[in-house]
Amino acid sequence: MVRIAGTDIPDNKQVYFSLQYIFGIGPARSEKVLVQAGVDKTIRVNKLTDEEINRLREIIDKEYRVEGDLRKEITLNIKRLIDIGCYRGIRHKHNLPVRGQRTKTNARTRRGPRKTVAGRGQKRGATKK
């Protein structure tokens, strides 16, 4: 397996798809890196020469923020929003949707499982016999 930016890249896949295993590299950026390195995107990783692998490594390391650095930046950005107390920061702090989605219904993924309320679901005034 080839290791680029701290991530093991699968050998048996095409380079175009293998690069997308790196956090921070999607389809568009993968294609851009391959064009810069002068590597055909349909070639398999195990067929790459050491020179091509080194070119890919250099381009990714120099020009793009990926993996740990990117994760750290995202975390710090969210922490900054929380610290300054802006609307988005408050939404992050309370684990609610940040981008204006409705929360009366839906938003279950962000809000977590339903919390049961005592006495809820029983008919009022109903007596057991």
From Swiss-Prot:
Residues 95-114 have a biased composition (Basic residues). Pfam families: Ribosomal_S13 (PF00416). GO terms for cellular component: cytosol; small ribosomal subunit. Residues 95-129 are annotated as: Disordered. One of its GO terms (biological process) is translation. Belongs to the universal ribosomal protein uS13 family. This is Small ribosomal subunit protein uS13.
